[in-house]
Amino acid sequence: MRRGFDALLLALPLAAAAAPPCDKPLYLSFDTGHMGVAPLVAEVLARQQVKATFFLANERTLSGGSSLDDQWAPWWKARAAEGHAFGSHTWDHDSWLADVGTAVRVKPSQGPQAGQVRTLDAAGYCAELQRPAQRFEAMTGQKMQALFRAPGGKTSPALLAAARSCGWSHVGWTPAGFLGDELPSERHSNAQLLQRALRDIRAGDILLAHLGIWSRRDAWAPAVLEPLIAGLKQRGFCFATLRDHPQFAAVPTR
């Protein structure tokens, strides 16, 4: 018994050395997109042993379907099983335009009303937030934390109040965390974006990228993603999901 206890004591420092405390955390996040790079993103994250947070909207894909349809359900289920975190990006990718009293005027880029301006009261906006969570649970068997990212990061007092009324908390990104994958590659090359990110990112930053951008000619992922993660690790950074962010850790699931 004593020998076994001594062996356990010897093993404890080794275990601690294998997983040092993370004192320079970064929070990598992805919004849905055309999903063309999604399998490659998943491969990089697995290879680098990085957990990220995904914000889900039902967006049109390269294959002609949508990012939350049955074709993609196994992909989302696999990411959930790997321990990534998830939030809502509104079902129809509703971009805020204006407050109308306590309601909000938005323009969806997806769904049957894509491109049409519509006004949503608090209940209507809550339904837009909740639909991705419901679909996520149907696909994965897991509940989503009540975190959301408004498309384009555009919020307002009425929009945030509507979200709070049904228990949702907004997550933006930090200035240096804007990784630039939606910028035109003719003016913002992958090499430039990588160099800027490695230069500017600081501990605690929330990083933003997408699972495919229609307008960018030279895809940002995985060309920038893997060297970015590797370079940040070399600088002493580590990665965590927004479940572990001090501002959002207490947010419940929906």
Language-model features and meaning:
Residues A19-P20, A52, L62, R217-R254:
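C-terminal domain-boundary segment and adjacent tail
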Residues A19-V104, S109-Q113, V117-L120, G124, ...:
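Active-site beta->alpha N-cap acidic-glycine motif
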Residues A98-R105, E182-R187, R217-A223, V251-R254:
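Histidine/acidic-residue-rich catalytic or RNA/ligand-binding cores of hydrolases
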Residues M1-A11:
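Sec-dependent signal peptide recognition
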Residues F30-G33, F55-E59, H89-H93, A150-G153, ...:
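Active-site-proximal beta-strand/loop segments in catalytic clefts of secreted hydrolases
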Residues A11-A18:
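N-terminal signal peptide c-region/cleavage motif recognized by signal peptidases
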Residues K154, L159-D200, G236-F248:
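His/Asp/Glu-enriched short active-site or ligand-binding loop at hydrolase and phosphoryl-transfer sites
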